[in-house]
Amino acid sequence: MTDTRTVADSEARSHTRPQGTGILGHPRGLVYLCASEGWERFSYFGMQSLLVLYLTHYLLQPEHVGKAVGFAVVRRAIEAVTGPLSTAALASQVFGLYAGLVYLTPLLGGLVADRWLNRTLTVTVGAMLMAAGHFLMAFEATFLLAIALLLVGVGCFKGNIASQVGQLYAADDPRRAQAYQIFQLAIALAVIAAPLISGTLGEKVGWHWGFGAAGVGMLVGLATYLAGRKWLPSAGPSDRANAENARRLTRSERRTVLALVALLPVLGATQVGNQQMFNAFLVWGEANFELQLAGFAMPVTWLLSADAAIAVV
């Protein structure tokens, strides 16, 4: 019987390009992947920092909510489960649905990349969909379409670009763990910057400016990714035979997978709390925090940047 590890190693070698030397002795492709992911996370968290505030203060107000195509159907579906909701409660429910679905779609994005497309093409499509979604958020009528594009875009982008980081290294390369630390640092910096820029523009200048900044960030991320394609793992065609072999796990690997699956409820519970930073916390903070800073009315979204900065330190 064909050895699964041999097949996987052979496939990895066949999808690898000469990487050159980037920073700290890592392949040059890592720089492009980290920068692309950083800009994607900037766009993602920029939009997310504004979503509940935008819904509460603008879109769900009586003079605007009727302009959002299809939202009446969504509202009826939500209130059929929860009962009648206030504006703030409905905004929280919409955010919760989005935040829950956005963590499920990467599973489908990985399947699409492995079965039909390849990681490079799937990441590219995801970035384009996310950029379109951010720009469409600027218009009331296209709110639900924008959310749908963002969900699909994140699903295509997020997991697949992280997988490409691993593809830059052999399985036993000691630099691999450090590469993911650098990758996470890029994400952390984006989480700090996004509310400061998109949040400030959205709250102080206009909602469409904040969402537009998120869209521009995603376009920069896409351009960065495409500029670095020559340094990334080569994108071979989808290979069904290798995909079949990849499912033949050893007993030890199956135990590891089961252990990871068992951890999912715990991780999910922690995310419920973490996501409240972008949901109830913002609404509560806006009402209860003293946001004056040296005579300047500080945007409430800056609280998210402060929290992210403290987490990094």
Question: What role is predicted for each listed range?
Answer:
Residues 1-29, 171-172, 181, 198-299, ...:
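Intracellular loop-helix junctions on the cytosolic face of multi-pass helical membrane proteins
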Residues 32, 90-91, 172-182, 186:
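Cytoplasmic loop-to-transmembrane helix junctions
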Residues 49, 107-108, 189-205:
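A gly/Pro-rich, aromatic-decorated transmembrane alpha-helix motif that marks the paired
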Residues 49-90, 276-302:
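Short amphipathic helix-loop junctions that connect adjacent transmembrane helices
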Residues 92-111, 305-313:
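Central cavity-lining transmembrane alpha-helices of secondary-active solute carriers
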Residues 115-127:
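Cytoplasmic membrane-interface "Motif A"-like loop-to-helix N-cap segments
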Residues 125-145:
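C-terminal ends and interior cores of transmembrane alpha-helices
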Residues 156-170:
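Intracellular juxtamembrane helix-capping segments at the cytosolic ends
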